[in-house]
Amino acid sequence: MKNILSRRDFLKLSGVGLGVLAFNPFKPERSPLALPQFPVSERLGRVFSKIDVHTEPSFNAPSVKVLYDDEVVVWQQEVITRGALDMNIINQRWVRTPDGYIYAPQLQPVKNVPNTPVTALPSGQLGFWAEVTVPYVDMRLEGAAASPHIKTLLEGNFPVRLYYSQVVWIDQIAQDGGVIFYRFNENGGRPAGITGGSYGDLLWGEASAFRLLTPEDVAPISPDVDPTSKKVVVDRTENYQTLSCYEGSEEVYFCRVSTGQYRDSYGNPVTEYLTPLGEHTTWRKSISIHMSGGTTGTGYDTPAVSWSTLFSGDGYAIHAAFWHNNFGVPRSHGCVNCLPEDAKWIFRWATPQNTLEQGDAVAEGLTNGTHVIVQELTI
């Protein structure tokens, strides 16, 4: 099987000869697929949406500038609100940047770590899993858009991007002008008949943005511990959202999370998004999955959600979230959102066990997974 496409084949597939710039709104002075020149710093932050930069870590402090979607800033230090705490919000964290302070929930913690691309698929394999290790990478669609997510972006003249920490399945490699590109295939990397909820979109991106996953990325944590002694406890209390992993009575991991929302966008109490209380069992794990649901206006459609550990047949899962940084505060439609590094640890620790060859793993029997308890404190 030929793994490297010719330049002619690549241009034909990606639509360059058909005026690809007409539907990808990138700056004309650079290639649509070229990685941007991100700030130089060990720690960076990606802006989720329009935000103000303040002179002090407080919403009452003057604004010195405004930043917009996907701008990247140097992340110098995380601090808490200066002066009296703002009792209207739960999260009091701010990030100090060279230009001032930004409210931490509005910045994704990212790094810029380009990689040396491979030029061929591993021998005997149909593809490989890879993680985005730069703040974002612009993607070019092959063929017609299938998912609502991509259709909406293109209709609004917005770029199609993957973001830091997303994990995707790469099934083709191409070279163009001395630059190597990978193709992300939403349907790849899973056993036959399992699509991971995807619509089957095919997207090309600059290869240096992606790090190949290794067996160590999915290696089990504490494999010698009796699986029946492992337990996950999720606290969905509205102002105290946490997750703990136990081996017997010993807590071995702790992190902040975001469970299902208690209120709608107008502040009205709602119940349809709450993470279900009670005892559950992990039954499926997926290295990367396409998540969608809800209705028009309140629905969601998100590709490449990494490190998903499903604990309910209704689709509730513990998984990474790259679209917000407001952990400790309810934010989801019922799932348990984690920082990517937290979701990955839980994924490796809980059962069933995965391998790179087995992107999706399903527990044998309904009770053979890891015990999950969702509770709510009453004060």
Where are the language model's segments positioned?
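Exported/periplasmic cell-wall-interacting domains
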Residues: P227, D264-S265, E272-L277, R284, ...
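N-terminal export signals
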Residues: K2-N3, D9-R30
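C-terminal segment of N-terminal export signals and the immediately downstream linker at the start
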Residues: N24-F59, V72
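SH3/SH3-like beta-barrel superfamily modules
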Residues: L67-P109, P159-S208
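Short, structured beta-strand/loop micro-motifs enriched in basic residues and often containing a Trp
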Residues: S49-S58, R140-T152
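Cell wall/extracellular polymer interaction/catalysis modules
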Residues: I173-L277
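SH3/SH3-like (including bacterial SH3b) beta-barrel domains
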Residues: P57-D69, H149-L162
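Boundary regions of SH3-family modules and the immediately adjacent low-complexity/disordered segments
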Residues: S31-F38, R93-V134, N185-P227
